[in-house]
Structure formats: C-alpha cells, structure tokens
Amino acid sequence: MTETFDCADPEQRSRGIVSAVGAIKAGQLVVMPTDTVYGIGADAFDSSAVAALLSAKGRGRDMPVGVLVGSWHTIEGLVYSMPDGARELIRAFWPGALSLVVVQAPSLQWDLGDAHGTVMLRMPLHPVAIELLREVGPMAVSSANISGHPPPVDAEQARSQLGDHVAVYLDAGPSEQQAGSTIVDLTGATPRVLRPGPVSTERIAEVLGVDAASLFG
C-alpha cells in the first residue's frame, strides 16, 4: 500500500520519516524531496531494491544510479581515495546541487548498475532528505520519473509517473532549484563537467583554480 505524507505538517513529517525508514529497510522504494528535483530512492546496499528502482523508471543498467549521503564524512568509506579538487568542491558546494563522480572503494558490496568502478555522490540541501539519509545511511537515488519523461519538481508529478511502484511519498512542496544537479567527473586526469546545472561552471572553475573552458575538455 502506498502512503503519502505532507512534510509541511510536523506530525506528518515525523510519521513519514519513520514510514520511509521502514520501507527502505524492507527493500522498498521511497520518493523524497531534494533541493534539485524529487528523487526515487532505495538502500544503496540492497541490490534487489536498486534493481526495482531501475525497473520502476524503465531504465537499464547502462545508466547507473547515483548515491546521496547525509554528511560529508560518509563519503570517506565510499571512495577509493579523495581525488584532487574533491575536498575543495565539497567544502564549497555541499550540501547542494553538485554531484561528483569518483572511483568507488573496491570493497563496497553494492550494485548500482554498470558504473565501471565509479560512483556519483551528492549531499542534498534539503532538511527532509538529510533527516532520512542520516537515519538510513547512503541511498541509491535517481530522479523520480519514468525514463525519458521530465523529472518531477513536486510529489504529485512523481506519483503520477511512478504510482504504486513506490511505498512512501514524502511531499515537501515544490523543489527549490527545479533542475538536475551539476555533475563533475573527478575520475580522470583533470575534472570534467558532464552536465551543467545550478552550480555554474564558472563557480566550479574558481574553486578549482582552473579555466572554465578546461572543464569541458
């Protein structure tokens, strides 16, 4: 049975977080608000739940799922090593609308899709998302839409696409940014912007001390 909670109401928010935590621990899917767009999430270490997430979206393994974290320190156990520039970008833009692609720790027992030893990480700037992430740990999260359809910027848009595939919808009103996060790849010799977004290339270049044009090389 699908449940929806209005997180503008403190009591519903509290009950919603409890319900979402239970759903995630049971291997089910949850729709959650973030600062960019609404996301559909699962326990990052539950491969069956991640497979269900991809199925709900109609998405193949060739488009692996990113991971949201609830604190800066969480990523220390998820990456092989902190690449050059990662700490600077995290200090400048986390929590916020910047996703970083890094080489994952080889010991991790998860299956996020065909990620070829990499993982995309982000710490969202949203109190409901952070509260949930701090309760359950890292979550595999993708935009809460059917593949090829517009990413939802509110819970109703997400529910209209995903319906009963999701156990719990946490409704916190419209997303602030209403656009997907900026994605920066830190797995190569130099940083590259894979997807422009709310965090501008110019701001990223300034933090890294490089020319903005080099980020598209």
UniProtKB/Swiss-Prot annotation:
Lineage, please?
Bacteria, Bacillati, Actinomycetota, Actinomycetes, Mycobacteriales
PANTHER family in the record: SUA5, THREONYLCARBAMOYL-AMP SYNTHASE
Q: What class of enzyme is it?
A: transferase
Look up keyword Nucleotidyltransferase and say if it applies: yes
Into which family does the record put it? Answer: Belongs to the SUA5 family.
What is the protein name given in its UniProt record?
Answer: Putative threonylcarbamoyl-AMP synthase
Species this chain originates from: Mycobacterium tuberculosis (strain ATCC 25618 / H37Rv)
- GO terms, molecular function: ATP binding; double-stranded RNA binding; L-threonylcarbamoyladenylate synthase; nucleotidyltransferase activity; tRNA binding
> What EC number is given for this enzyme?
2.7.7.87
Q: Name one GO biological process term.
A: tRNA processing
Role this protein plays:
Required for the formation of a threonylcarbamoyl group on adenosine at position 37 (t(6)A37) in tRNAs that read codons beginning with adenine. Catalyzes the conversion of L-threonine, HCO(3)(-)/CO(2) and ATP to give threonylcarbamoyl-AMP (TC-AMP) as the acyladenylate intermediate, with the release of diphosphate.
Annotated YrdC-like domain residues: 14-199
Coarse class of the primary localization is cytoplasm
Query: Signal peptide span per the entry?
Result: none
InterPro entries membership: DHBP_synth_RibB-like_a/b_dom (IPR017945), Sua5-like_dom (IPR006070), TC-AMP_synthase_SUA5 (IPR050156)
Record keywords: ATP-binding, Cytoplasm, Nucleotide-binding, Nucleotidyltransferase, Transferase, tRNA processing
Is-annotated flag, keyword Endoplasmic reticulum? no
Describe the reaction catalysed, as an equation: L-threonine + hydrogencarbonate + ATP = L-threonylcarbamoyladenylate + diphosphate + H2O
Localization annotation: Cytoplasm
